[in-house]
Amino acid sequence: MWNELKSAKEINKEKPFYINILAKDVFEIDTDETILVQGIIDLYYINKNNELILVDFKTDYIKEGEEDKLVKKYNKQLEIYKKALESSLKRKVVHTYIFSMQLNKLIEL
């Protein structure tokens, strides 16, 4: 990832966002109501191939081989980030990653 960032066309860090989404997409409830979600996207960039890449940094303590625990824990959060980014930029996120600080490893969702 670091090498790809060096040649990126555009890099954005710690960007706040707001998005209206269905409450049932966040909580296990049966409703068609929408809620306003706000957050901060750690990193997104446009690589040299003009692809939109989303990265979220996590500091959770996990052991090598337990990467799936991070994916399970944060998948819903990153889906919301992805929707927010795609909605605001009007383009598709090609890759979504968690960067585990503990493992110093990029994990694709």
What is each model feature region?
Residues 1-109:
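Structural signature of nuclease core domains in nucleic-acid processing machines
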